[in-house]
């Protein structure tokens, strides 16, 4: 718990710290509806193709926080790095309002030490720097921590009933600090239990979502292999328009373009969120590169709890 607390504290303010530490980051815009951001897809695609002719666009993800489209790219003929939506890989930002481009690989840091520190805090917090083994170990320790907190309340609560909650005695310094300890431990224990429970679910979500995406990919391949495909190819904005027409009440939170290995557009759709920073659970929807009926693979029912736990765990310092 001490490790998770020490590493989690700077991560709470990762966005603010990274914004301060990146000296050439474009100014952030105001929040913007995802549908308005997607309206800039044709212009963004053209701008990226013109400015980076040697790059191939793999996926596009909107950021409702500041009205930006993230184009995940790779060198033509090259290999794409590990990535997920706006995380990882080579990402080119397109500011919809101004039409400006910024390649995130060209970021200049005020302090490389701060950047390295934040990266270290992240990998320690999520997996102890040990990949999946470290992640699973942290989940197991969180389970033990919750058991310890709950059992501690059960064991010590009867002994504390003789004293009203919040009472601070001043007869001696030992009693004074003991009462403060009881008061703060009630809040700290509750917070620790919430963070541990939500953290365990995040690990389960990570495993479950990976399995869901693999299953969805297999189901989509089988579904479209049994159909005759059109020889013509949809432009990204045409594929997007079909999805918006098919799912008008949903937000489109990601779009992956067809590749040599898969002639399918892969979209993630989600329920609209209250805030731009809220987590949105993506449901996989596939569309043939030549158009046709979309193929939706529902998310397992238990994964629908993910938004509650991830919003509780990650952006909990945002009170507005």
Set out the residue ranges of the language-model regions.
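Conserved histidines in hydrophobic membrane contexts and catalytic metal-binding motifs
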Residues: 1-320
